[in-house]
């Protein structure tokens, strides 16, 4: 399935404003039922996912960090990325160009939680030759 113009308008409104189906329908001049059906089709096609997001800036015990990683064997990048993504509290994993192979976005409850993530969970993956951790001190409009 390839999204048409209306689908893209729906996707954009959901992405930027998290609008209700009724609000989107009113903005586009179509029925709420049509919006609901299109969102369902977009979800079924794996194009969109609807979920609740947290703002770590306003929640206690929420530490956002990025962990840059190098992998011993470049041919295993995708496999290692998928393995890392299975670890609890990992929000995303991306393959990079440049100094590091992967960047991991992780949300933990404390510095102790970050240490546990790096020393126990991430080290359990194997084949990781280097890590560098970047702790987020303040985010602007970051929802996870």
PLM features: residue spans?
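A compositional/biophysical signature of low hydrophobicity enriched in polar/charged and small residues
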Residues: 1-144
């Amino acid at each position: 399935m390839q999204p048409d113009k209306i689908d893209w308008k729906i996707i954009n409104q959901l992405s930027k404003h998290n609008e209700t189906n009724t609000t989107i329908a009113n903005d586009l001049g179509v029925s709420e039922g049509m919006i609901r059906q299109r969102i369902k089709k977009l979800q079924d096609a794996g194009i969109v996912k609807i979920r609740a997001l947290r703002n770590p800036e306003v929640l206690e015990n929420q530490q956002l960090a990025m962990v840059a990683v190098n992998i011993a064997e470049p041919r295993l990048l995708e496999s290692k990325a998928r393995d890392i993504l299975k670890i609890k509290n990992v929000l995303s994993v991306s393959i990079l160009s440049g100094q590091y192979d992967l960047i991991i976005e992780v949300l933990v409850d404390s510095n102790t939680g970050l240490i546990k993530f790096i020393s126990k969970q991430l080290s359990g993956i194997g084949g990781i030759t280097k890590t560098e951790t970047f702790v987020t001190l303040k985010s602007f409009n970051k929802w996870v």
